[in-house]
Amino acid sequence: DMGRQAARYRERRALPAGDAAHVHAPTGGQGLNIGVQDAVNLGWKLAQVVRGTSPSTLLDTYQAERHPIAARVLKLTMAQVALMRGDERTMALRENVQELLAMDQPRKRYGAMMSGLDIRYDFGEGHALLGRRMPDLDVVTADGPRRVSTLLQEARPVFLNLGEPSRFDIGAWTDRV
């Protein structure tokens, strides 16, 4: 297995992403997914720093958020490669894994791991959804219904009030959100 990962995701002005930050076996086709996720995570941060609306220390969060995700993918692909071996012990293990994947919950969990839909950034204590991926839902805006993904195309943070209308005063943030 040739899997490896950069120790640091930021060295002054160098910010590796995708295969420059981590390489692993192509098993499961996760390389493209994780590379795109790196780019999305880093892209909006770079835009904020270049525009001067966020300090350059924002780029330090790239390491904290993406490095653990890539380390997990490397372990997952290492396990997948190991399960391809043809020896008797691996074949026994593979049969046990197949039995587990015949069950609903293990199959859903593994599917989420393989697709990257289970990614959660660890921001500490708070709401259970903090750091989780937002589904691309239809939301109602002042301009009418829109998909969440269309709100993210301007490289600006998006504040979604999922509670009562006009409950939050974001006046101090209007130039950033």
What are these regions (language model features)?
Residues 24-33, 40, 59, 69-73:
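Catalytic cores of eukaryotic secretory-pathway lumenal/extracellular enzymes that build
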Residues 1-30, 34, 76, 115, ...:
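FAD/FMN-dependent oxidoreductases across multiple families
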Residues 28, 44-47:
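Hydrophobic alpha-helical membrane-insertion segments
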Residues 37-45:
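Short amphipathic alpha-helical face segments that pack within enzyme cores
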Residues 33-36, 87:
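Short, solvent-exposed loop/helix junctions and linker helices
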Residues 48-177:
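Helical substrate-recognition/capping region of FAD-dependent monooxygenase/halogenase enzymes
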